[in-house]
Structure formats: structure tokens, C-alpha cells
């Protein structure tokens, strides 16, 4: 299930931007330019996880 990504300030749907970042693997810089509102740009820059290779397990620090 895919949850929608919505800007909490203005209510704009940002799911298309997440698709372009994660599926099409576009650069964040190119996607952010398409949004004129600063609140949407901030949301995209801080709330979307970078693309990860999920086949590699992270090493755990036990200390």
C-alpha cells in the first residue's frame, strides 16, 4: 500500500514528486525546481528517504 505524501502546510499532493525521485531516480534538485512554494520544497528535501538498496543489510552497532 502506498501512502500519499501531502504538504502539511498547504495541503498539496507531493506523491508525483516522490514517484519521480524513487522510481525514475531523478535528482532532488531537478524535482524541487518544479515546485514554487517553499513549504513544498522543504517537505521534499527533508521527508523523503533517499533511494536505498534493500538487499544490503545495514551493519548493527551493538555498543
Swiss-Prot record:
Induction annotation: Expressed in the early phase of the viral replicative cycle.
Which InterPro entries does the record match to this protein? RNA_pol_7kDa_chordopoxvir
Q: What is this protein called?
A: DNA-directed RNA polymerase 7 kDa subunit
User: What do we know about how this protein assembles, alone or with others?
Assistant: The DNA-dependent RNA polymerase used for intermediate and late genes expression consists of eight subunits 147 kDa, 133 kDa, 35 kDa, 30 kDa, 22 kDa, 19 kDa, 18 kDa and 7 kDa totalling more than 500 kDa in mass. The same holoenzyme, with the addition of the transcription-specificity factor RAP94, is used for early gene expression.
Report the subcellular localization.
Answer: Virion
Its function?
Answer: Part of the DNA-dependent RNA polymerase which catalyzes the transcription of viral DNA into RNA using the four ribonucleoside triphosphates as substrates. Responsible for the transcription of early, intermediate and late genes. DNA-dependent RNA polymerase associates with the early transcription factor (ETF) thereby allowing the early genes transcription. Late transcription, and probably also intermediate transcription, require newly synthesized RNA polymerase.
Gene that encodes it: RPO7
Chief localization class? virion
Query: Species name for this entry?
Result: Fowlpox virus (strain NVSL)
Q: Which family does it belong to?
A: Belongs to the poxviridae DNA-directed RNA polymerase 7 kDa subunit family.
Q: Could you name the Gene Ontology cellular component terms for this entry?
A: DNA-directed RNA polymerase complex; virion component
Q: Catalytic activity, per the record?
A: RNA(n) + a ribonucleoside 5'-triphosphate = RNA(n+1) + diphosphate
